[in-house]
Amino acid sequence: LGDAGAFNVNRAKELIPSVQLYSSNPRNTGINIRGLGSPFGLTNDGLDAGVGYYVDGVYYARPAATTLDFIDIVQIEVLRGPQGTLFGKNTTSGAFNITSRKASFKPGADFEVSYGNYGYIQAKASVTGALTKKLAARVSFSGTQRDGLIDNIATKRATNDINNLGFRAQLLYKLNNKTTITLNGDNTQQRPDGYAQVVAGVVTTK
């Protein structure tokens, strides 16, 4: 996924057969598997999807979550077809099951920077290690920026840019050799200058 630049579901769908994601903005997002899932349009704002989205076993109830950047993940599992037996409701079309990297008592750190055209730059970092003999932590960061792709002649600025920031913190408590307790928390912000729409190939836009 990293080599392909798939830092969210919208990018990852290009690598996953039968998955479609349509999004003009996070509140107006539809995700389908094999053509079924949720409608695309203003009618889906606030509605549960037919494709379940899970991160470390936690259900994200709104399709808008699929527009967020992945933060320090280890795998993406795409389950096609009804998954009610394993995941419960809202999985009539399938489910995304995402697993993040866990905190470790062994010290470690990762850092990655990517760049591209239109001022695209992405930075990812994570640090993990022991705090005490029974407590370990992991802190992760992801930031993505890109200049706008559409010139707004009224404001003299490029719009439809990317401005994403995400953080995740984990605590791992080792109660004994058979029992561990994990506490996760994350925060993600999207602050783009969008979402401009243009008429393509019909009239001159002004």
Residue positions per predicted region:
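Juxtamembrane/interface motifs at transmembrane-helix termini
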Residues: 32, 82, 158, 201-204
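Acidic, small-polar-rich N-terminal luminal/periplasmic segments of exported/outer-membrane proteins
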Residues: 1-106
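Glycine-rich, histidine-containing beta strand-loop boundary motifs that form or position
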Residues: 25, 141, 183-185
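Short intrinsically disordered, low-complexity coil segments enriched in acidic
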Residues: 1-6, 96, 174, 180, ...
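Conserved thiamine diphosphate
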Residues: 170
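Short secondary-structure transition/capping segments
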Residues: 33-37, 150-151, 194
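Outer-membrane beta-barrel translocator/receptor signature
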Residues: 48-50, 62, 71-74, 85-152, ...
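Flexible loop and strand-edge segments within Gram-negative outer membrane beta-barrel domains
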Residues: 180-206
